[in-house]
């Protein structure tokens, strides 16, 4: 389903693609308070160790850290509160069916601003074993070596 992202990418979960095989991606909206969206627009968000879970037919994002807004007085938000994700019912049912299989989980890949709204790209992920991670690194290094050799050859 890979949607293209428009606008400013605010936060990326770089460890997600290292630790998981991403099977399918979904674009979801996030229910936020006023100070949260202001902090996100300022780029003060971290997706490290965050995950999504389906609870009572609704998707929630856990452990996503949005720093408190500097000018937000007593109405400021809690930095790591669970946040509701806005998905179509069909997408939620797909995620429920897939996550009930052993080894599948839902991880946020990136958060970006699209048409003034904060969106999160979540991925249906299957955990990698250590040997898979090493194999991925080997492949990446080999590709880098080939590109370096081609570049050197072109220079003459």
UniProtKB/Swiss-Prot annotation:
InterPro entries: SmpB (IPR023620), SsrA-bd_prot (IPR000037), SsrA-bd_prot_CS (IPR020081). One of its GO terms (cellular component) is cytosol. GO terms for molecular function: RNA binding. Keywords: Cytoplasm, RNA-binding. Disulfide bonds: none annotated. The keyword Cytoplasm applies. GO terms for biological process: trans-translation. PROSITE patterns: SSRP. It is found in: Cytoplasm. Belongs to the SmpB family. PANTHER family: SSRA-BINDING PROTEIN, TMRNA-BINDING COMPONENT OF TRANS-TRANSLATION TAGGING COMPLEX. HAMAP family: SmpB (MF_00023). Required for rescue of stalled ribosomes mediated by trans-translation. Binds to transfer-messenger RNA (tmRNA), required for stable association of tmRNA with ribosomes. tmRNA and SmpB together mimic tRNA shape, replacing the anticodon stem-loop with SmpB. tmRNA is encoded by the ssrA gene; the 2 termini fold to resemble tRNA(Ala) and it encodes a 'tag peptide', a short internal open reading frame. During trans-translation Ala-aminoacylated tmRNA acts like a tRNA, entering the A-site of stalled ribosomes, displacing the stalled mRNA. This is SsrA-binding protein. It comes from Shouchella clausii (strain KSM-K16) (Alkalihalobacillus clausii).
């Amino acid at each position: 389903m890979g949607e293209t992202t428009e606008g400013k990418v605010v936060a990326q979960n770089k460890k997600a693609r290292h630790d998981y095989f991403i099977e399918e991606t979904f674009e979801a909206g996030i229910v936020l308070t006023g100070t949260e969206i202001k902090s996100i627009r300022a780029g003060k968000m971290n997706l490290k160790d965050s995950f999504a879970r389906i609870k009572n037919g609704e998707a929630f994002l856990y452990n996503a850290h949005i720093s408190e807004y500097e000018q937000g007085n007593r109405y400021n938000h809690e930095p790591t509160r669970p946040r509701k994700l806005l998905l179509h019912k069909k997408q939620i049912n797909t995620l429920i069916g897939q996550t009930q299989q052993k080894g599948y989980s839902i991880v946020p890949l990136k958060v970006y601003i699209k048409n003034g709204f904060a969106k999160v790209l979540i991925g249906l992920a299957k955990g990698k074993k250590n040997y898979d991670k090493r194999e991925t690194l080997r492949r990446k290094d080999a590709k880098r070596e080939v590109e370096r050799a081609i570049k050197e050859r072109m220079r003459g």
